[in-house]
């Protein structure tokens, strides 16, 4: 998988990809990340890529010409072009899986300032938001896209790891514990120390349903629950 990130702030992207799982994925050649400085496509003095908006108003707007030049410099027939914007569809695990499973090259355009010339949307395949709040620029959103998609690709993390993560099968992850066994009168559940793998698996499945019902009931899809989880779900719903 190749990611091409079009940004005004390459250092933000570079500092993140030099750490942790993303760095290891790059070293293993599971992913490739190309950082594209939007200012390199400006034809104006001081590499200007923004200007005042027609009709008046506060805030600068990203100009269409450097944006399109940057996109076209890396786009191929196998590319999908994403724009990070609060006007886009909200990113979730289902969308992440779609990108991970269906594309070889993802171009991410980082939004900035007051916005972008509306005409750029003719060159965008998907607009993506990471939530209903405002951040300074699209760099953080682009890194969230890269990180979440990369985790699902072969040879990035162990298959077992992402199968057990939150949002797989529309459930939150089960509680996890480590040493010490007891802290301020709070003990690790005994089942986890029993060595009985079937009981541990059963407990974890129960806890996934319980936690999701309490914290994110909107996530649950009963068609994705196994028989044991469905029993817990029905019991919990009956108690409410």
Swiss-Prot record:
One of its GO terms (biological process) is tRNA N1-guanine methylation. Gene3D superfamilies: 3.40.1280.10, tRNA(m1g37)methyltransferase, domain 2. GO terms for cellular component: cytosol. The keyword DNA damage does not apply. S-adenosyl-L-methionine binds at residues 111, 130-135. It holds the Pfam family tRNA_m1G_MT. Transmembrane segments: none annotated. CDD domains: TrmD-like. It comes from the Bacteria. InterPro entries: Alpha/beta_knot_MTases, tRNA_m1G_MeTrfase_C_sf, tRNA_m1G_MeTrfase_TrmD, tRNA_m1G_MTases_N, tRNA_MeTrfase_TRMD/TRM10. Homodimer. Belongs to the RNA methyltransferase TrmD family. Specifically methylates guanosine-37 in various tRNAs. HAMAP family: TrmD. This is tRNA (guanine-N(1)-)-methyltransferase. The gene is trmD.
């Amino acid at each position: 998988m190749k990611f091409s990130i079009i940004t005004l702030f390459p250092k933000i992207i570079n500092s993140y990809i030099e750490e942790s799982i993303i760095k290891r994925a790059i070293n293993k050649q599971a992913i490739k990340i190309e950082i594209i400085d939007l200012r390199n496509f400006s034809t104006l003095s001081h590499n200007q890529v923004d200007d005042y908006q027609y009709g008046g108003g506060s805030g600068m707007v990203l100009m269409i010409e450097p944006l399109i030049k940057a996109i076209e410099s890396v786009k191929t027939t196998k590319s999908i072009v994403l724009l990070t914007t609060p006007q886009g569809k909200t990113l979730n695990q289902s969308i992440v899986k779609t990108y991970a499973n269906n594309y070889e090259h993802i171009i991410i355009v980082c939004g900035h300032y007051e916005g972008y010339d509306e005409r750029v949307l003719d060159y965008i395949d998907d607009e993506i938001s990471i939530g209903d709040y405002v951040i300074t620029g699209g760099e953080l959103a682009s890194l969230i896209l890269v990180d979440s998609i990369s985790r699902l690709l072969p040879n990035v993390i162990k298959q077992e790891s992402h199968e057990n993560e939150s949002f797989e099968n529309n459930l939150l992850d089960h509680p996890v514990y480590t040493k010490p066994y007891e802290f301020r009168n709070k003990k690790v559940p005994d089942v986890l120390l029993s060595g009985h793998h079937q009981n541990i698996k059963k407990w974890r499945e129960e806890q996934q349903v319980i936690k999701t019902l309490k914290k994110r009931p909107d996530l649950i899809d009963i068609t994705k629950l196994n028989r044991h989880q469905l029993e817990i779900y029905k019991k919990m719903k009956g108690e409410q």
